[in-house]
Amino acid sequence: MKDLLARSNGETAELVLCSLTSFVNLLLTGNVPDEIKPIFFGANLIFLNKKCGGVRPIAVGNTLRRLCAKAAGQCVEAERISHYGSVQLGYGHPKGAEAAAHSARLFVNSVNSNDTVLFKVDHKNAFNSVRRYMRLQRTRETNPSIYPFTHAAYNQPSKLFYNGKHISSEVGAQQGDPEGPPLFADTINPPHSELKFHLQ
């Protein structure tokens, strides 16, 4: 796609860019026929080995779907990051995990009391476990401008293809969807914010 849009292609590149922009804008309205959604929002699966054993499924989605998801995410990225505040450092914060680890170490070293606890949670397979209706509800509340696209992508099961067969993707976001991490962060932000409020 980058080659098609190269300046060296002159007028052809401009025509491709205009057509691509129109197509992405159409997708952002959620205007995708129901018959096409399972395939368009589906993906090919590849499996990566985890360090501790097991495999991590990665969905390699349609290039145009990924492009649209990136465009949708960029439209609301600043809003999302400011909405999360300091509660969530996984999405939109380069080296956020490092910052969290350093902050936790500083906190533990500065505490002089026996009634203080540092509670660390690792949500096992959480990315793929959050119910889609919750993601859609949070997107409607926090980022209504991209809700039509998110609804089109996640309001019904999509197809994941592997080795000539397909399985139905019905829960969570696809690993490999550019909107997956922020949708996960959007969904878990309210309980994390509430927990912070109660613990202060």
Language-model segments: residues:
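Conserved pre-catalytic core of RNA-dependent polymerases
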Residues: 1-190
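Short, intrinsically disordered, charge-balanced linker/junction segments flanking boundaries
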Residues: 193-200
